[in-house]
UniProtKB/Swiss-Prot annotation:
This is Aspartate carbamoyltransferase catalytic subunit. The gene is pyrB. Carbamoyl phosphate binds at residues 53-54, 103, 131, 134, 263-264. The lineage of its organism: Archaea, Methanobacteriati, Methanobacteriota, Stenosarchaea group, Halobacteria. InterPro entries: Asp/Orn_carbamoyltranf_P-bd, Asp/Orn_carbamoylTrfase, Asp/Orn_carbamoylTrfase_sf, Asp_carbamoyltransf, Asp_carbamoyltransf_Asp/Orn-bd. Catalyzes the condensation of carbamoyl phosphate and aspartate to form carbamoyl aspartate and inorganic phosphate, the committed step in the de novo pyrimidine nucleotide biosynthesis pathway. It catalyses: carbamoyl phosphate + L-aspartate = N-carbamoyl-L-aspartate + phosphate + H(+). It comes from Natronomonas pharaonis (strain ATCC 35678 / DSM 2160 / CIP 103997 / JCM 8858 / NBRC 14720 / NCIMB 2260 / Gabara) (Halobacterium pharaonis).
């Protein structure tokens, strides 16, 4: 993959995706081979929203490549609290680091940041927009379990505000898959994403219940309801807990169904699913390290 920045899954071709996944598999098999490869590099971590997995896996990935990270820390302890603009912040951080990983509550912020710096900018989530590096590790996990073609994939939950969903849906258009979107009507895919999928010729179906499609699925990607994105708390309460997967429900699924979740989960996957062979979400999270190592290896 040869891009100056990674801002959206829409910029990734099939070749880009497979290249990163192949490199990640090589690194996972022999991490010592790259243990000092980027010992002269520093990665800037600018997270304007909370993060556990994404931030820690980028930190781990950079250090396992021999480099180090510079963390802006809490927004409350930075000059952002004093009113500093995003443009000024990234122009300063550019002078300290060789690449910037940015998470921000406003859609389009990584693209804006990329216009002010010459180092690579990697989108680690921009509001309800995109999360392309999550998609790469999702694709890696799907490929490990089921391949990437001739699949029926269900994506369930908050499709309106879920940025991981938007990125994954775009990336899957590069492959021979049928996508089924399961959500309340109020949380269906945004019109812009639907338009992109239609223009790509993707096989897409929308549902309001999981039971009608579960037995056909090879992969079920579950997401939480994005409470922090709702403009009205009452709107959130109307849909919270409406879609839930448990072991009893999965009795009607294929034996080899892969159940995924970008995490954190709230109540949308019951704890009893953890003990089934379907559960893949913790391994999915762990895959973030080799995938982000591969991405950094190609972009630095």
């Amino acid at each position: 993959m040869r891009h100056d920045h990674l801002l959206s899954a829409k910029q990734l071709s099939r070749g880009d995706i497979e290249g990163v996944l192949d490199r990640a598999a090589e690194i996972a098999a022999d991490p010592d081979a790259v243990a000092e490869k980027h010992s002269d590099k520093l990665l800037g971590l600018l997270f304007f929203e909370p993060s556990t997995r994404t931030k820690m896996s980028f930190d781990t990935a950079m250090k396992r490549l021999g480099g180090d990270t510079v963390d802006m820390g809490s927004v409350d302890s930075s000059s952002v609290k004093k009113g500093e603009s995003l443009a000024d912040t990234v122009r300063v951080i550019e002078g300290y680091t060789d690449a910037i990983v940015l998470r921000h509550p406003s859609e389009g912020s990584p693209k804006l940041a990329s216009e002010f710096v010459d180092v690579p900018v990697i989108n680690a989530g921009d509001g309800a927009g995109q999360h392309p590096t999550q998609t790469l590790l999702d694709m890696y996990t799907i490929r490990e379990n089921a391949g990437l073609d001739d699949l029926t994939i269900g994506i369930m939950g908050d499709l309106k505000y879920g940025r991981t969903v938007h990125s994954l849906a775009h990336a899957l258009t590069n492959f021979d898959v049928s996508q089924h979107f399961i959500s309340p009507e109020s949380l269906q895919l945004p019109r812009s994403v639907r338009y992109d999928l239609h223009e790509s010729g993707a096989q897409v179906r929308e549902h309001t219940d999981i039971e009608s499609v579960l037995e056909t699925l090879d992969v079920l990607y579950v997401t939480r309801i994005q409470r922090e994105r709702f403009p009205d708390e009452n709107e959130y309460r109307q849909v919270a807990g409406e879609y839930r997967i448990d072991a009893d429900l999965l009795e009607s699924a294929k034996d080899d169904l892969t159940v995924m979740h970008p995490l954190p989960r709230v109540s949308e996957i019951a704890a009893d699913v953890d003990e089934t062979e379907h559960a893949t979400y913790f391994k999915q999270a762990h895959n973030g390290v080799p995938v982000r190592m591969a991405l950094l290896d190609e972009m630095l």
